[in-house]
């Protein structure tokens, strides 16, 4: 495990790097450093840890992020963690160098040669928590003197009690910490005395948390996968709260999520209390969480509930994306909810499927998919299937439409090509789909005989590039592009990277991708 000194320095916010002048010449009081091409690389070199935002002034999501990013910068400044920003409309080459494809893009830098994307919630507490974890060693060494302080560094802290000579167990724990350091703060000690004080003996793992029973002791075998499952389960409250900071965690948990929609904090507190015993009984099988229906009521439509009719309850299978809405004419009683949840888990209750009507004819160049035909068309094992997931209000989708039709014609008009490749599209706001869609348009290729490994398209949206993508990634290697058969192709129809976060939320449909007047917030 790393030395104690590195942890103490990080806790104290002491800088190990030389002091540098602010990279921007602005005279405002912002704690976010505005970087340009000629200052970016020096700034990254001179700081151990930097979170950089690549943005565009016209981007609506960037504007929403700005105050949260500023709060996080101020909070992290005392810990010598720097937050910076780059305007990609002015520094296009720099943004291209770092693979920026959408706005905002956030990347964590540890020097110029080590950077990775930040994919967490775009809220100050989430950014702050994440960056503090990044500033510490993957496993922080604790002693009797700093133990209480380390336990309170984050909402969840995992501490291992392992003897120094137990090399194999130390190796397993360190590898686990490396793989989960983005989500959880890990610490460790070899002190048998400290272990005894905490009621355990070497080797042991204890998870400390700010909620429920405050701590959980792991009692299984010291194996990575079992430990990982324990940490994921124990770090989730019995009845939590769905919001921007927690949503992605629930979605990646690998088990269903039961939503409890209610308008007031008092109602949500009462429901959390009512269903706590059920949540405890089913822990590890399903997560329970309340959700503020005044702030996030639009999300109810994604679960096939009627928006604005609250309180409400629904279950979402986070793996298959199947939805199970509870009858909104009924009250949320312990008895009825228990029966409903157990029925869903047992497979006795069928999922609700939102689908447009199946088209009477489907003879156009692009095959139209609805939820009821998704399996039949996309999962056809004999064909390479390219699918555009779109939203009717999406400007980039509208711009792509004529080119996508021309692309479809290249295959549809050739009998041999048509037998091997399908070019298709689905309105992801009007149909339940099993795929996780983060922005519009999203284009994926489902190769023949390899449907569980779809390939997402991230290139420029020209007919030639799309056709070549199908050729290069499809099983049949169909080379359909013929410039004589298409109108002037031109360049990428977007003209600029897409505003990357436009999740499929029907009732949130904005008038444009850059600006949206929405009654509800986004998760």
UniProtKB/Swiss-Prot annotation:
Subcellular location field: Endoplasmic reticulum lumen
Active-site residues annotated for this sequence: 59, 62
Glycosylation sites: 170
Catalytic activities: Catalyzes the rearrangement of -S-S- bonds in proteins
Assigned EC number: 5.3.4.1
Disulfide bonds: 59-62, 394-397
Annotated site residue numbers, Lowers pKa of C-terminal Cys of first active site: 122
Major localisation: endoplasmic reticulum
Biased composition (Basic and acidic residues): 478-502, 512-523
Site (Contributes to redox potential value) residue list: 60-61
GO-annotated molecular function: protein disulfide isomerase activity
One BP term from GO: protein folding
Region span, Disordered: 478-523
Renumbered ranges of motif Prevents secretion from ER: 520-523
Keywords: Allergen, Disulfide bond, Endoplasmic reticulum, Glycoprotein, Isomerase, Redox-active center, Repeat, Signal
Class of the enzyme per the UniProt entry, highest EC level: isomerase
GO cellular component: endoplasmic reticulum lumen
InterPro entries linked to this entry: PDI_thioredoxin-like_dom, Prot_disulphide_isomerase, Thioredoxin-like_sf, Thioredoxin_CS, Thioredoxin_domain
Its job: Participates in the folding of proteins containing disulfide bonds, may be involved in glycosylation, prolyl hydroxylation and triglyceride transfer.
Family: Belongs to the protein disulfide isomerase family.
PANTHER family: PROTEIN DISULFIDE ISOMERASE (PTHR18929), PROTEIN DISULFIDE-ISOMERASE A3 (PTHR18929:SF132)
Name of this chain's protein: Protein disulfide-isomerase
Annotated source species: Arthroderma benhamiae (strain ATCC MYA-4681 / CBS 112371) (Trichophyton mentagrophytes)
């Amino acid at each position: 495990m790393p030395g104690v000194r590195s942890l103490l320095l990080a806790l104290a916010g002491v800088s190990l790097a030389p002091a540098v002048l602010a990279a921007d010449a602005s005279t405002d009081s912002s704690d976010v450093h505005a970087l340009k091409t000629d200052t970016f690389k020096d700034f990254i070199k001179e700081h151990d840890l930097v979170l950089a935002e690549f943005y565009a002034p016209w981007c609506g999501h960037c504007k929403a992020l700005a105050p949260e990013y500023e709060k996080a910068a101020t909070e992290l400044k005392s810990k010598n963690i720097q937050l910076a920003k780059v305007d990609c409309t002015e520094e296009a080459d720099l943004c291209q160098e770092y693979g920026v494809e959408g706005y905002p893009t956030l990347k964590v830098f540890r020097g110029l040669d080590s950077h990775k994307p930040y994919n967490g919630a775009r809220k100050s507490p989430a950014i702050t928590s994440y960056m503090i974890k990044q500033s510490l060693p993957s496993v922080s060494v604790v002693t009797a003197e700093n133990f209480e302080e380390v336990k309170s560094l984050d909402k969840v802290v995992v501490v291992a009690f392992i003897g120094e000579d137990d090399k194999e167990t130390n190796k397993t724990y360190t590898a686990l910490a490396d793989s989960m350091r983005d989500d959880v703060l890990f610490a460790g000690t070899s002190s048998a005395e400290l272990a005894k004080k905490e009621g355990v003996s070497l080797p042991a793992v204890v998870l400390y948390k700010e909620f429920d029973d405050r701590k959980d002791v792991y009692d299984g075998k010291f194996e990575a996968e079992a430990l990982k499952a324990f940490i994921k389960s124990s770090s989730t409250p019995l009845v939590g709260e769905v919001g921007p900071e927690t949503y992605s965690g629930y979605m990646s948990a690998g088990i269903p999520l039961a939503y409890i929609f209610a308008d007031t904090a008092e109602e949500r507190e009462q429901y959390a209390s009512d269903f706590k015993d059920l949540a405890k009984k089913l822990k590890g099988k399903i997560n329970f969480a309340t959700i503020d229906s005044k702030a996030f009521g639009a999300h109810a439509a994604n679960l096939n509930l009627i928006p604005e009719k609250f309180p409400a309850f629904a279950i979402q299978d986070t793996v298959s994306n199947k939805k199970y809405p509870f009858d909104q004419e009924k009250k949320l009683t312990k008895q009825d909810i228990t029966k409903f949840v157990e029925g869903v888990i047992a497979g006795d209750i069928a999922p609700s499927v939102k689908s447009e009507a199946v088209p009477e004819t489907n003879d156009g160049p692009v095959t139209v998919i609805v939820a009821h035909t998704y399996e039949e068309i996309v999962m056809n094992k004999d064909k390479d299937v390219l699918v555009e997931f779109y939203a009717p209000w999406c400007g980039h989708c509208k711009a792509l439409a004529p080119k996508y039709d021309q692309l479809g014609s290249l295959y549809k008009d050739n009998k041999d090509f048509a037998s091997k490749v399908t070019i298709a599209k689905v309105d992801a706001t009007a149909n339940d789909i099993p795929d996780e869609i983060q922005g519009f348009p999203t284009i994926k290729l489902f190769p023949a005989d390899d449907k569980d490994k779809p390939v997402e398209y991230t290139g420029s949206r020209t007919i030639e590039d799309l056709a070549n993508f199908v050729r290069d990634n499809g099983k049949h290697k169909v080379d359909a592009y013929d410039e004589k058969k298409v109108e002037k192709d031109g360049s990428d129809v977007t003209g600029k990277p897409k505003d990357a976060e436009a999740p499929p939320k029907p009732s949130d449909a904005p008038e444009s991708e850059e600006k949206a007047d929405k009654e509800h917030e986004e998760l």
